[in-house]
Amino acid sequence: MEETGLVPVIQIDSAEDAVPLAKALLAGGVDIAEVTFRTEAAEESIQRITSECPKMTVFAGTVLTLEQAKKALHAGAKAIVSPGYDDQIVDWCMKKNATVIPGVSTASEVQHAVKKGLSVLKFFPAEACGGIKFLNAIRGPFAKVRFMPTGGISEENFTAYAKLKNVIAVSGSWLCTKENIGLKEWDKITEACKKSQREFPRS
């Protein structure tokens, strides 16, 4: 995740689009994606990508229930990502030695996650909850925690987030919008990935 630095958040309405989308991302130099459980096609999409595109690392996103977490891991997801912090999901994933990246937006939630032994967290919704100012402020007391900011991250501001020392990767939908996927604009997605990779600040 840190090497790529970009985690596209994708919403797939038809599992038929999963593999072409994954190939478009890979062609653009992005080998990781967060497939959200916002549609009925999520589980099958994860299965198809992990089966047919082994170079793509798939995270399951918008995981709200333990049942979704179980389905996601069974489908081949390498990590469970949730918009908020859910003890049941976190505890179950940790018992299964499965990577879990819960969402946080306050210092109290970060401290709770650290107490559980987590060091990589999703900061959501980033822009609405203080954005870069929050991440700079939280770095003092939680120097070992790395964040994946999501929510309001765009082509215009992702580089500012990526420059922060406590950001492991930036996440958003600007690389492949719902419209891009619906219209099967695979070339546009590839070009968006290449452009963002060129602009990504490498240390």
Where do the PLM segments sit?
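Glycine-rich phosphate-binding active-site loops on the catalytic face of alpha/beta enzymes
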Residues: 83-89, 122-132, 166-188
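Catalytic cores of alpha/beta
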Residues: 21, 65-75, 108-116, 153-169
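N-terminal amphipathic alpha-helix/helix-capping segment at the start of soluble metabolic enzymes
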Residues: 1-11, 20
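C-terminal helical cap(s) of enzyme catalytic domains, especially alpha/beta-barrels
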Residues: 93-98, 179-203
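Glycine-enriched alpha-helix->loop->beta-strand junction motifs that scaffold or abut catalytic
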Residues: 26-31, 52-56, 73-80, 94-101, ...
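Glycine-rich, proline-tolerant flexible connector loops at the mouths of alpha/beta enzymes
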Residues: 26, 30-53, 174-184
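Conserved, mostly hydrophobic/aromatic
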Residues: 8, 25, 72, 121, ...
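Catalytic beta/alpha-barrel core
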Residues: 9-11, 31-39, 56-64, 69, ...
